[in-house]
A protein has these predicted regions:
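N-terminal secretory signal peptides and thylakoid transit peptides that target proteins
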Residues: 1-17
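Periplasmic-binding protein-like
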Residues: 114, 132, 160-171, 196-205, 235, 284-307, ...
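A ligand-binding cleft/hinge motif common to bilobed small-molecule-binding domains
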Residues: 90-94, 224, 229-248
Length: 343
């Protein structure tokens, strides 16, 4: 009968441990990606399940506004956890400058070739997967007819009946532009450089403002229950989606125009499973998926081969200089919080 020494036992135990550990070394990465993006209705209940079924991978999603999304990417820059980020163009400009997103040009995204040139900013550093419109959201029970002009928000009939979105949210540029237009008469697309006049005009709106918030879902709920008349200014992704579900809300088409809110998608630099990230973005740009996106998010498609769904009636949208916005945003946030929300 063989005699086992302590050395034999230790050697055998070590071999067993290595054998047990081996599967974890060779185990493949799970077929899943972490996507950070807006908390928009229709993403997790319609769009993402379609992509998951079609391509056989799991989408882990966390909804937050674009600036918070960027902060999360910064915090994990050394070891990214996110594969794709879906953010507004002004924040994607910052992400590009900080080198936390990777260019789409040259990536395996065939549908990118059919996307409009103006929807591939910065030489396809990212891509706009839809183009929703922002204006006044209003309660259709309490406001009849809907506002024909942004000027109606300043009417004393709406005292304490308006919620303004925080300037930390990109859509907050719309009431600032509307105020600048009312003060100067210039077209909305030219009013970014008239922000000073816009802030002075916004001060006149304060008696009508119940609160300033960064919690868009809560503001949307208050709009739907009739606690407020106007919400300035979410976009069609949320408002018309809720209208279609029976909520008493609508998106105004003021005579001064609506503002394009290009929604971008980008690959996070050095993010995990980049090939699945490319598949995800390519599917967002597929003509059939683009038609679903246009219908679901009430926005203009960006793939030129997409057949626009019947009944989608958005006017020509004011397109902004988002780089100018990005360069001035911090200054405007400080002024907004000093003079409008905190003054």
């Amino acid at each position: 009968m063989p005699r086992f020494t302590r050395r034999h036992v230790l050697a055998a135990s070590s071999g067993m441990a290595l054998g047990l550990a081996a599967p974890s070394v060779v185990r493949a990465q799970p077929r899943e990606i972490f996507v950070g993006g807006p908390a928009s209705p229709g993403l997790t209940d319609m769009l993402f399940p379609l992509i998951e079924r079609k391509h056989g991978f799991k989408i882990l999603f966390e909804g937050s506004n674009s600036l918070i999304n960027l902060e999360k990417i910064r915090a994990n820059k050394a070891r990214p956890t996110m594969t794709v980020t879906m953010m507004d163009d002004p924040v994607l400009i910052l992400a590009e400058r900080e080198k936390v997103i990777a260019p789409l040009k040259g990536a395996n995204i065939p549908n990118l070739a059919d996307v409009r040139a103006d929807a591939k900013p910065r030489d396809a550093m990212w891509v706009n997967w839809c183009q929703p419109a922002s204006s006044i959201a209003y309660n259709t029970d309490s406001v009849r007819p809907g506002p024909a002009s942004y000027a109606e928000a300043w009417d004393s009939r709406h005292r304490d009946k308006i919620i303004l979105i925080s300037m930390r949210i990109t859509q907050a540029v719309v009431p600032l532009l509307a105020a600048a237009h009312l003060a100067t008469g210039k077209p909305l697309a030219e009013c970014l450089k008239e922000a000073d006049a816009g802030f002075e005009k916004l001060k006149e709106l304060k008696p009508n403002v119940l609160q300033v918030t960064s919690n868009a879902p809560q503001a949307q709920q208050l709009l739907e229950t009739g606690e407020i008349d106007f919400f300035l200014s979410p976009d069609t992704r949320t408002v018309l989606f809720r209208k279609a579900q029976g909520a008493p809300v609508d998106q105004a088409q003021p005579k001064e125009g609506m503002v394009a809110m290009p929604a971008g998608a980008a690959l996070v630099a050095n993010g995990p499973n980049p090939e699945l990230g490319m598949t995800f973005i390519n599917e967002l740009l597929d003509p059939e998926t683009q038609a679903l996106i246009a219908k679901t998010f009430y926005s203009n498609p960006t793939n030129t081969k997409t057949v626009k769904p019947a009944g989608l009636d958005l006017p020509e949208l004011a397109v902004l200089d988002w780089e100018y916005f990005a360069d001035n945003r911090n200054r405007w946030i400080e002024r907004f919080e000093r003079e409008i929300s905190g003054g």
